[in-house]
């Protein structure tokens, strides 16, 4: 009788389930590693790129070029914050599953969705091209090859992570919007 009550409480999420913890922990670890990779890749590009070097590579409108660089900086900041949140969660004992789920929810909306629909509308997602090996990102204006070379592998990685987090969010977890 006592075992049945305990099983029901585990199922209802009132008692932590070790298997659930390990799944959420693994997703938090993977997400943190992904975000760290994005931060390193984007920061390497931004540290080597100036407005002038982009315009020398391909003459483009200065305002649009500034917006693209601003979007990349914003993405790096959000991803760095998400990576730090994941790292801190993984260091805590006991592992806080509910906080991890909220963090993954925030990463999904602040980092993943922001990549495909940036605030400044510097590019958009081409959902038809996303699974063909072509970048899922379409720019509104022509951009230098170095920028396309940055975003092609990133868009594939973001697509994969979006699928993982969307599946995770829809798999019956208690993730809910943060108000």
Curated annotation (Swiss-Prot):
InterPro entries reported in the protein's UniProt record: DUF3907
Q: Which domain of life is it from?
A: Bacteria
Q: What is this protein called?
A: Uncharacterized protein YpuI
One Pfam assignment: DUF3907
């Amino acid at each position: 009788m006592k075992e049945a009550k305990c099983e029901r409480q585990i199922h209802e999420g009132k008692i932590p389930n070790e298997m659930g913890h390990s799944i959420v922990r693994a997703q938090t670890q993977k997400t943190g590693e992904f975000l760290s990779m994005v931060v390193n890749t984007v920061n390497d590009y931004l540290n080597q790129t100036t407005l002038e070097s982009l315009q020398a590579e391909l003459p483009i409108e200065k305002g649009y070029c500034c917006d693209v660089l601003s979007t990349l900086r914003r993405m790096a900041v959000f991803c760095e914050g998400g990576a730090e949140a994941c790292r801190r969660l993984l260091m805590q004992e006991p592992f806080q599953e509910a906080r991890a789920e909220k963090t993954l929810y925030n990463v999904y909306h602040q980092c993943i969705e922001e990549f495909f629909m940036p605030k400044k509308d510097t590019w958009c997602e081409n959902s038809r091209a996303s699974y063909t090996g072509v970048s899922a990102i379409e720019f509104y204006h022509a951009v230098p090859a170095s920028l396309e070379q940055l975003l092609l592998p990133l868009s594939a990685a973001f697509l994969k992570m979006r699928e993982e987090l969307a599946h995770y969010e829809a798999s019956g977890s208690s993730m809910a919007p943060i108000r």
